[in-house]
Amino acid sequence: MESIKEIFRIGKGPSSSHTMGPQKAAKIFTERHQDASSFQVILYGSLAATGKGHMTDIAIEEVMRPTAPVEIIWQPQTFLPFHPNGMKFIALDIDENPLDEWTVYSIGGGALSEGKGISDYFATQEVYPLNSLHDIMRWCNNNGCSYWEYAKKYEDNDIWDYLLNVWEVMKQSVKAGLAHEGVLPGPLHLPRKAATYYVKASGYKPSLQSRGLVYSYALAVSEENASGGTIVTAPTCGACGVVPAVLYHLYKSHNFSNERIARALATAGLFGSIVKKNASISGAEVGCQGEVGVACAMASAASCQLFGGSPSQIEYSAEMGLEHHLGMTCDPVCGLVQIPCIERNAFAATRALDAQLYASFGDGSHRVSFDRVVNVMKQTGHDLPSLYKETSEGGLAKGYNLE
């Protein structure tokens, strides 16, 4: 299993798979072909279906146009075998003859793959010897350790500096989102709500105030993402509001130190990495259950650890966070990371805290394991038609009328 750094990537929204990934690929290909007279980029499947709404073409053109003209070709009905988010880069000479071509896939969370296994250009080093939560939890119990200590054992020495930086960016994204008002970009003309929710929540009694504040923090980050602001994938841009909202709320309301938050992030990253290794965090591959569902599991695990949960209680908390998002479709209206994505982040953040509380009332024993739910999520995602996997051809996206 790869480093948790691959789960937490700092970048700009609105989509890790549709903007961050393609822009990174475009930069690599452009650097290889500085002598090209022009470029063609063919976008396939989900990348083509919702690329306009996600600003995929703009992200690619920003990188390639300074070197040579680029033509974007959209093929939403063509799905390459390896992954729904396929793209082909072609470098052309002055006579428009191909100099080179490169097929690459944006596999979720800003990560790229050539689909070549261990010989892949983007193959990352495996840093963890164990790939299932069952085995990791057994290690923790045998050694009297928590999940963050397992991460500490195998990550590089700079992991805490990295996570503290991630936490700083998360805090800034909350603050920026709360400070901004107005309308989000795109044809939906969706008003920002975070600032209003924060003000209203502050006027309620503590029992309701807590929930309202969590809503406002999640909305703040998700709205920053939708407007192209700087956020952290956790595990993706589309689900980037859940973990920061939960941790920021606990940081403010319970005075947890930055160091304890970093340890909670390590635990969250471990759970996210397990899903990425054994299933997927790509909405184009498994639907929103792989994005918001996984984010809820990560936030549940992190919060349960902060409140002193045992390894089994933390596992139970994360299991519920993911289990109760099984089957969730990815059907963004107009291909934008706005409806229903932003509200889903807010609801998942409060659900994460509910799962943590539920798990803390018991000893962590339960029948369905986290690993089992991950496997079910993978199978469910593969069973879902492409209509419900980031193509905007079904569900809410199909039924919504801009008028």
Regions found by a protein language model. Give the residues of each.
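C-terminal regulatory domains involved in ligand/effector binding and gene-expression control
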Residues: P66-Y204, G212-L213
